[in-house]
């Protein structure tokens, strides 16, 4: 079977598994990885080999750009301290812990042990986004975990690059490594912001939504390739900082509403396809990885995998329950007080360290030979241990995070979010009424002006009542639900009437599509 047919089968399997996961209300990465694992052992179906550059260059730029684009700079700033400590401190701590364990308990050379530690240290942004998107977690927890996963890939990959170079060349300088770490990471962050600012004139001049969408995808790849291949800084951090900058400026630089709606829809579909393919492909790699492990018994491999997984979990738990005790010291040093997380939140974040595509790509990218021509020590074992860590964290954490959230009685701050939303809508409505009074209404009938004013005044009254009630009252929620159901029924009847007119040949397809688009937009607005 050719690669194209295999790819089509995998896409179909990914869509089916994602639907099953949605039906069972579990994070879909779990089903996709397990499904890929099963598909990998189907006789006659060739396993698609993933070159590491495919993950780094094809998958990561759009996925990181999407995650950063929809992140909140305000929330990331508010939780900058824990995110920075996790993205740098926890990555280095985990790398050292893994290296220590595999060196002394598995007898792997120090330099190679640090390579494995650097591979497994960063959490995966794709997995974090995919899992937390479906779970109702407090915004503080979601912001910290997603911010950590966005930033720590850059830290982990820079450390990985240094560790691999030390193994291949046999030379290592801690001062050169530290300087390289700062230049590569800081250079990537700075480059992303500079490129985001530099392409602003391009976005302002684009008025075609199709071109806008195509360029929004292309620029994510350009940023990554320019960072990695030309300037040799962190492409991951460059794309993240670029995505954050774009997300902040986008509503102003491209004011066309229909283009923004199409852009978001395009990215949602693209991200779903890329995530689905990525998790299925991860699961499919085990068969080829096992081929190079003939010198180890099954019990040895399982024991080594369990040791590495336990070290990952313990390092994260130790960090989350020890480092926060240093907050008073950081408060004095930074002259800024940060409110410490509750123990329930720390327990949840300790259990949220999923590994994924970035770790697998890094393991696959380990060179086969050293500079002298000899084989890279324990490369096959590194691949196996990396795969097992990815599988264990995705499946075990993915299946148990939901029950853990319920057991800890952690809830998302829906009421606070609702109040913030109502306050924002209220401010917009007041601005519209103020502008309405300033506009020249000579060309607009007085009756239409009054109807518009009454609509805005009714919105203001409802928003103020909701804010006073602290979000949404039960009566308001019931009446809103009833009104939405009532309005959906009317839209359904409208749609049927339009289709009947089309079926009778009384309206052109183009006119029918325009009317249906308006009805679809109105119905989608009811969904929130």
Predicted regions and their residues:
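Transmembrane helical cores of multi-pass secondary ion antiporters/exchangers
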Residues: 1-419, 430, 479, 499-528
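Cytosolic C-terminal regulatory domains/tails of membrane transporters and channels
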Residues: 410-528
């Amino acid at each position: 079977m050719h690669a194209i047919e295999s790819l089509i089968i995998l896409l179909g399997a990914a869509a089916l598994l994602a639907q099953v996961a949605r039906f069972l209300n579990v994070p879909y990465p779990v089903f996709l990885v397990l499904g890929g694992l099963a598909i990998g052992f189907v006789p006659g179906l060739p396993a698609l080999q993933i070159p590491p550059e495919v993950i780094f260059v094809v998958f990561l730029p759009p996925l990181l750009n999407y995650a950063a684009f929809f992140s909140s700079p305000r929330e990331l700033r508010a939780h900058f301290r824990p995110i920075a400590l996790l993205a740098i401190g926890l990555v280095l701590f985990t790398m050292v812990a893994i290296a220590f364990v595999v060196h002394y308990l598995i007898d792997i050379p120090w330099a190679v042990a640090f390579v494995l530690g650097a591979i497994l240290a960063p959490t995966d942004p794709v997995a974090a986004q995919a899992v937390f998107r479906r779970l109702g977690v407090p915004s503080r927890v979601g912001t910290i975990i997603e911010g950590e996963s966005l930033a720590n890939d850059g830290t982990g990959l820079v450390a990985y690059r240094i560790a691999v170079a030390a193994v291949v060349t046999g030379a290592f300088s801690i001062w050169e490594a530290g300087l390289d770490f700062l230049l590569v990471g800081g250079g990537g962050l700075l480059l992303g912001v500079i490129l985001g600012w530099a392409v602003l004139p391009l976005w302002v001049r684009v008025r075609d939504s199709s071109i806008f969408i195509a360029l929004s995808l292309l620029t994510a790849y350009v940023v990554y390739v320019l960072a990695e291949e030309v300037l040799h800084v962190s492409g991951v951090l460059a794309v993240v900082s670029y995505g954050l900058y774009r997300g902040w400026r986008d509503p102003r630089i491209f004011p066309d509403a229909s283009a923004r709606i199409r852009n978001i829809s395009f990215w949602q579909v693209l991200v779903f396809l890329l995530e689905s393919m990525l998790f299925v492909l991860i699961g499919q790699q085990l068969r080829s990885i096992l081929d190079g492990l003939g010198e180890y018994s099954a019990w040895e491999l399982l024991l080594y995998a369990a040791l590495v997984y336990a070290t990952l979990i313990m390092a994260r738990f130790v960090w989350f329950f020890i480092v926060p005790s240093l907050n008073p010291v950081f408060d004095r040093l930074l002259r800024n007080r940060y409110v410490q997380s509750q123990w329930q939140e720390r327990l949840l974040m300790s259990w949220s360290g999923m590994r994924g595509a970035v770790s697998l790509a890094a393991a696959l990218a380990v060179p086969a030979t050293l500079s002298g021509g000899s084989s890279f020590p324990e490369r096959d074992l590194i691949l196996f241990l990396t795969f097992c860590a990815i599988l264990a964290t995705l499946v075990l954490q993915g299946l148990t995070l939901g029950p853990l959230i319920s057991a800890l009685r952690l809830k998302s701050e829906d009421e606070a979010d609702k109040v913030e939303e109502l306050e924002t809508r209220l401010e917009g409505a007041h601005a519209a009424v103020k502008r309405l009074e300033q506009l020249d209404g000579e060309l607009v009938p007085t009756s239409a002006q009054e109807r518009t004013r009454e609509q805005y005044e009714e919105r203001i009254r409802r928003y103020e009542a909701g804010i006073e009630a602290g979000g949404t009252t039960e009566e308001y929620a019931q009446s809103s639900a009833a009104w939405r159901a009532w309005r959906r029924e009317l839209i359904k009847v409208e749609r049927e009437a339009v289709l009947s007119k089309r079926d009778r040949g009384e309206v052109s397809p183009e006119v029918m599509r325009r009317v249906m688009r308006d009805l679809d937009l109105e119905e989608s607005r009811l969904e929130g």
